[in-house]
Amino acid sequence: GEDGTIQGLLELAKIPYVGCGVLASAVSMDKLYTKIIVDGLGIRQAAYVPVMREQLADMDRTVSRIESRFSYPVFIKPSNAGSSKGVSKAENRAELEAGLREAARHDRKLLVEEMITGREVECAVFGGGSEEIKASGVGEILAAADFYDFDAKYYNAESKTVTDPELPGDAAEQIPRAAAAIFKAVDGYGLSRVDFFVKADGEVVFNEINTMPGFTA
């Protein structure tokens, strides 16, 4: 319900709804297009290599292109999928090939990203349109797994979020500003949750924006 299709249906039916419109929902659901927008803002994010499903027919060439860019480990993601479905971490070539095939089950556009070592944090954003955009304080995700995958989000009771964590440098001030800028750039309205990593030196790295956050938020 957050990729713009339901929003478009509601608009055609002239039914009011809460949250982002068609454009913001569709763009934010597509990780590749979100990255292109965030690149334009000059906000740091994980380096990435886009891969199309049809390129997996020549797996050796595709994997070699990725390996020429990144060292292991890397993360593989479908461009359009929520709740971390189809996301995997690869420590070697065999795991990368398996991860690409799994991600391709969920979407024809894939992303392979460098691994960012840091704390996972999130920031809520409200407003948009004619209203002032306001960002919340920062929450930190304490995942009970190697990374915050589908099972860690929904099935592992050890995963939790803490509010107002102590962060290095001026990360706590940077994050709300960056979250509001990204929300505005995708034409957000109503509410969204913007996720980041914070590295040990205080550097803030954008992860993704969720225009209709789940109950883990």
Q: Model regions: which residues?
A:
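Short glycine-rich anion-binding loops that position phosphate/pyrophosphate groups of nucleotides
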Residues: 1, 79-81, 212
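A short, GP-enriched loop/loop-strand-helix hinge that lies immediately N-terminal to
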Residues: 1-29, 44-52
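Active-site anion/phosphate-binding pocket segments in diverse small-molecule metabolic enzymes
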Residues: 137-139, 178-185, 189
